[in-house]
Curated annotation (Swiss-Prot):
Residue ranges of the motif TXY: 171-173
High-level lineage: Eukaryota, Fungi, Dikarya, Ascomycota, Pezizomycotina
Official protein name in the record: Mitogen-activated protein kinase hog-1
Annotated GO biological process: cellular response to oxidative stress; osmosensory signaling pathway; stress-activated MAPK cascade
Organism in which the protein naturally occurs: Neurospora crassa (strain ATCC 24698 / 74-OR23-1A / CBS 708.71 / DSM 1257 / FGSC 987)
Entry GO CC: cytoplasm; nucleus
UniProt GO MF annotations: ATP binding; MAP kinase activity; protein serine kinase activity; protein serine/threonine kinase activity
Amino acid sequence: MAEFIRAQIFGTTFEITSRYSDLQPVGMGAFGLVCSAKDQLTNQNVAIKKIMKPFSTPVLAKRTYRELKLLKHLRHENVISLSDIFISPLEDIYFVTELLGTDLHRLLTSRPLEKQFIQYFLYQIMRGLKYVHSAGVVHRDLKPSNILVNENCDLKICDFGLARIQDPQMTGYVSTRYYRAPEIMLTWQKYDVEVDIWSAGCIFAEMLEGKPLFPGKDHVNQFSIITELLGTPPDDVINTIASENTLRFVKSLPKRERQPLKNKFKNADSSAVDLLERMLVFDPKKRITATEALSHEYLAPYHDPTDEPVAEEKFDWSFNDADLPVDTWKIMMYSEILDYHNVEASGQMMFQEDVPPQ
């Protein structure tokens, strides 16, 4: 039985195994508090996220189960990875992941980025999205604050399919709305991986300009700002809007022509503007894919088709439509945690068997 240590962080009890020391608050993550800590087993710094009251409602239990399944399944250099998971005596769940020093939001608010950093960051975002999309996973909430970066400029995407709780400590917190694809904003019938490409385009534009591209005050204002730059959506896109109220609103907007992005991004080179033009397209079907973006000339300095892997298998979403009681989600969660530790233990045993005797 693991030994647990208690600490008070922001008035919240953190119960962690004795494997971890030196807890420091980092902020609020998706429905949980995040601390940095020292992993005494590996001597690495890690991030520990406490999922608060994961079994209080079926919705929370399902959301926690989904995050656990995603963290277990997604294994890629540009995606945050799980290094440990445990349930405390108080039945809170703790996810342990690698710790990166900062995020793109903090970088963008501190100083302008040079071209080679913009290219390298965008390359890594697209490399991560190629893998994630190949697994049948859509991020849905891509924004600078959930793109983590370390001192070597290695980049990892975090918080998949989850809404991040606003951190009260973070001044000038950027709204998710700025990066949201029009098909989500206007509740079109169906959306898919293309929403992440739109968000990545907004992030790319912000790296180029140093400020958000579409800083809407609300959804109506947001859509209006988008049409000022990209013009009125084409009729075949407008006709896919299911809600009559939304349809009426879009049709009431003045007709606008798409503005050439080179007029707005005067300091960016032509290949950057060309890639951005292909990402910020109203029709999701005509938006560039992550795989295509990796082959674009703007990312040529980093593109290596032999080192841009796809997922070995699709993520199993079969649980996502399930409407189950808390106790069932709890049993399923315990099973996943046991499976994770069994796989980790067998991997370590195999590694030990491979090590030749001294």
